[in-house]
């Protein structure tokens, strides 16, 4: 029987609902419970797959190929025993699309289709389905309490809490305690009004997570409890931390897990063992020294556009006991700049992306890394550009390009994938006329790594499974020419022999991959490719001293 914890936010956005929810999930998992998480997004887009990174940040790809909210990345990084799927994230757009399709088919037998019950029933069905087979499902509602877009979700939560009952549901509400410097005190009124807004919907919070920059004394906690109908011990202070990976320990010290276990009747559970999290925090806060990675992209003004890459580099720093400082380099600006901006870098990374804008700047950075023996990692488009750069400057194909940028190029090193097998082994076919949304090669795919290559050495095995998100791929017609020039194809897809990884054997560390290894990195386990990349950056750092 699944128990549900619903997570809402009030006062302002960006309070950290996803991180707080994931920290609670990690705490419950540490007590032996089987936990999953769900994110409900109120926007009308069917999914974030076609949204600009400047609007939404990163699109996180699950193993089964869902394009989801970046919060699902937090969920997977904090949980070890649960992987997110298509069931774990849905939007208003997805719900309305489903309901309208049913109406067109006549499923409602001519009845009037309304928000209540049709939209709310669809939301409830999705929540219950996602929670099947788990002890606890933590469900985050995007946006802020009071937003008009989230009202159907709030009503669905209210109904579920009534239908499932007190012993199977809880509501955790995040709020802000602002500090007024002129009065030298924390203000509780915004929290009171936020809870009042919840109560007007018919929802009583059970736990309050109070975000603040300052310590909160017992009197303030009692005041909050009095005016919000919450137990004083359920008023939890979440003070700004040096790293988000300190949050599980902070919640543990305030007995959040005990509150939940008591409510749900979970008895005889072991105490939470947070040793792994303590080790992560210790390594993060006490690095031996700093290495610098230049990340060359076109969305660098918004670091959330590369959230999983940023986190994977952080995790690699943990594994190598160094601090990884990311120097963001605007690829478009680099096209007209001198490469001297890259001279302080111990390693260079070109992440994924779409479109021609900024590609010449990225290739300029790739060429610099190749010619100056700087460790280089290319991801998705980063691999495609590494191949094009090598073809232009080493393999004698000066007009090499991708058909994404130039359909009439003389040397189409990169072309549209027209056929591939998806994660279920089903044939997928695409053309230039296909819709943009949901039409890429998505999700986990198996690859075979070539024996004797650095990539195989890094992974330590012949077959790997990594997640993909792309429409274009290296053209196999040019494999022989590229390899004769000195670049090695070090990995192929198991099903269609598509190029998955390339490397330069004569370079100290130059690897580029078509997939997205950042999606499977975690703070406790890291990822072998990123760990090896930062190890190479350490070597480069020592050489340059």
From Swiss-Prot:
InterPro entries: Class_I_gatase-like, CTP_synthase, CTP_synthase_N, GATASE, GATase1_CTP_Synthase, P-loop_NTPase. Pfam families: CTP_synth_N, GATase. UTP binds at residues 13, 187-192, 223. CTP binds at residues 13, 147-149, 187-192, 223. Its EC number is 6.3.4.2. Residues 1-266 are annotated as: Amidoligase domain. Allosterically activated by GTP, when glutamine is the substrate; GTP has no effect on the reaction when ammonia is the substrate. The allosteric effector GTP functions by stabilizing the protein conformation that binds the tetrahedral intermediate(s) formed during glutamine hydrolysis. Inhibited by the product CTP, via allosteric rather than competitive inhibition. The active site is at 380 (nucleophile), 516, 518. GO terms for biological process: 'de novo' CTP biosynthetic process; pyrimidine nucleobase biosynthetic process. L-glutamine binds at residues 353, 381-384, 404, 471. Mg(2+) binds at residues 71, 140. It is an enzyme of class 6 (ligase). GO terms for cellular component: cytosol. It catalyses: UTP + L-glutamine + ATP + H2O = CTP + L-glutamate + ADP + phosphate + 2 H(+); L-glutamine + H2O = L-glutamate + NH4(+); UTP + NH4(+) + ATP = CTP + ADP + phosphate + 2 H(+). Residues 292-543 form the Glutamine amidotransferase type-1 domain. GO terms for molecular function: ATP binding; CTP synthase activity; glutaminase activity; identical protein binding; metal ion binding. Keywords: ATP-binding, Glutamine amidotransferase, Ligase, Magnesium, Metal-binding, Nucleotide-binding, Pyrimidine biosynthesis. ATP binds at residues 14-19, 71, 239-241. Pathway: Pyrimidine metabolism; CTP biosynthesis via de novo pathway; CTP from UDP: step 2/2. It comes from the Bacteria. Homotetramer. CTPSs have evolved a hybrid strategy for distinguishing between UTP and CTP. The overlapping regions of the product feedback inhibitory and substrate sites recognize a common feature in both compounds, the triphosphate moiety. To differentiate isosteric substrate and product pyrimidine rings, an additional pocket far from the expected kinase/ligase catalytic site, specifically recognizes the cytosine and ribose portions of the product inhibitor. Belongs to the CTP synthase family. Catalyzes the ATP-dependent amination of UTP to CTP with either L-glutamine or ammonia as the source of nitrogen. Regulates intracellular CTP levels through interactions with the four ribonucleotide triphosphates. NCBIfam families: PRK05380.1, PyrG. This is CTP synthase. The gene is pyrG.
